[in-house]
């Protein structure tokens, strides 16, 4: 035995029952990477639920601004009123009751849809077949002549004229309110400025 063997002795060779090809150092067992409780009866933490509960929040402002409009009568026996009526002189007038029957709304309009409330009211008195549905409005909105009653209100400045401009940049308005004190009864003057304040107006779409 030389000096090298004394300094670096070989490992002791103990008798082994393994096959000669398996007589090597076995790899270490894998480490426990959980670093948690290693007891056999230990239950692992349950994963967090990812399903969300149904939302109970109120609808967004866009949903509230665009309610669905009914396009059919409320009852099977109720007939839809005509939206437009053309007089003998060729004047085409919008029927407010037809819009009330289908649901009110407001959009930007052109000046061809401007309607005189006075002409509408006076024409209703002339028509025996109730072409404009005044009876229909009075049955469902008995307080429509009251200035405090609004089917749908859209605030506008009192300083602004309810008249439409030539390019149709304003909104169309039909007044479902009582006329002002200077004109208690609607007349066929064609002047829209004598039918109450602009805040008494409802706005209806021309191309419903």
UniProtKB/Swiss-Prot annotation:
Residues 179-197 have a biased composition (Polar residues). Residues 1-78, 154-208 are annotated as: Disordered. Residues 40-51 have a biased composition (Basic residues). This is Uncharacterized protein C29E4.11. It comes from Caenorhabditis elegans.
């Amino acid at each position: 035995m030389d000096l090298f063997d004394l300094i670096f002795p070989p490992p002791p060779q103990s008798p082994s029952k393994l096959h000669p090809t398996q007589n090597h150092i076995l790899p270490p067992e894998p480490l426990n990477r959980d670093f948690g409780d290693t007891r056999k009866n230990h239950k692992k933490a349950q994963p967090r639920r990812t399903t969300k509960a149904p939302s109970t929040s109120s609808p967004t402002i866009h949903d509230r601004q665009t309610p669905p409009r009914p396009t059919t009568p409320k009852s099977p026996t109720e007939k839809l009123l005509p939206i437009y009526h053309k007089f003998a002189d060729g004047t085409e007038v919008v029927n407010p009751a037809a819009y009330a029957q289908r649901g009110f709304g407001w959009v930007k309009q052109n000046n061809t849809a401007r309607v005189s409330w006075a002409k509408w009211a006076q024409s209703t008195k002339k028509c025996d077949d109730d072409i404009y549905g005044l009876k229909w409005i009075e049955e469902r909105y008995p307080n429509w002549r009251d200035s405090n009653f609004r089917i749908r209100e859209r605030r506008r400045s009192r300083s602004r004229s309810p008249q439409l401009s030539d390019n149709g940049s304003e909104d169309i308005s039909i007044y479902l309110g009582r006329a002002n004190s200077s004109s208690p009864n609607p007349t066929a003057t064609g002047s829209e400025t004598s039918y109450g304040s602009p805040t008494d107006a409802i706005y209806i779409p021309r191309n419903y």
